[in-house]
Amino acid sequence: MRIRFLGHAAFLIVTEKGTRIITDPYQPGAFGGAIGHAPIPETADIVTISHQHMDHNDAKNLPGTVTVFDQPGEYEELGVRLKGVSTYHDDRRGQERGPNVAWVIGADGLQVCHLGDLGMALEAEHVTAVGPIDVLLIPVGGTFTIDAAGATEVVEALKPRLVIPMHYRTPKVKLNIDYVDSFLRDKPNVRRVGGSDIEVTPGTLPKVPYEIWVLEAAL
């Protein structure tokens, strides 16, 4: 499986069979230009959307025809297993920012979880629903999502082998959110990949307890 960090909360996941999945595609220039990433040129077979905010739901502007999943439930498409777990965008059961769907993507013997704009601590029922995770794509910037401390708690609850942070402030994301360094501080096993793409297989995943890989946005 290949994972490419496109920017913000958008990733391209390509399975060994060539199925292409894009998570939370952003609208370039959203929020008065706060989202400064270039338009996404990648084609996709499947798009997962965690919630209906413009920096996460711009499937309509992707090239080609895609199948969009934006509701909780269990699905299978082109040999990829998809599970949408209902969570919230805030810590008040959605009263401030509404619902959020955490997506578990199963392919190539791997379970990849994209948490979207998770804004709450996971309860036992959520951990059970998500299930065992190999790769966790997690927001860490706070303000609109869990912050560095909250993200650390979620990592400890889900126990993935590989953690890839997302949804943090960068020169191309000028939202009022924190930089990734707050999440990385005092953590062991941090690797700055120096690129946008990684290849992962069950045999090449980090062993124990987990590693954090920081990717550079491709766009």
Predicted features and spans:
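Conserved acidic residues
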Residues: 45, 134, 161
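Conserved hydrophobic/aromatic beta-strand scaffold that supports enzyme active sites
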Residues: 10-12, 74, 102-104, 135, ...
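Pre-active-site segment of Zn-dependent metallo-hydrolases
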Residues: 12-48, 52-72, 86-100, 118-129
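Zn-dependent metallo-beta-lactamase
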Residues: 1-17, 27, 79, 83-85, ...
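Short secondary-structure boundary segments
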Residues: 25, 51, 140, 166-168
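Metallo-beta-lactamase
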Residues: 57-109, 188-209
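Binuclear metal-ion centers of metallo-dependent hydrolases, dominated by the metallo-beta-lactamase
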Residues: 4, 96-97, 158, 162-219
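Active-site-proximal loop/helix segments of hydrolase catalytic cores
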Residues: 91-158, 175, 179
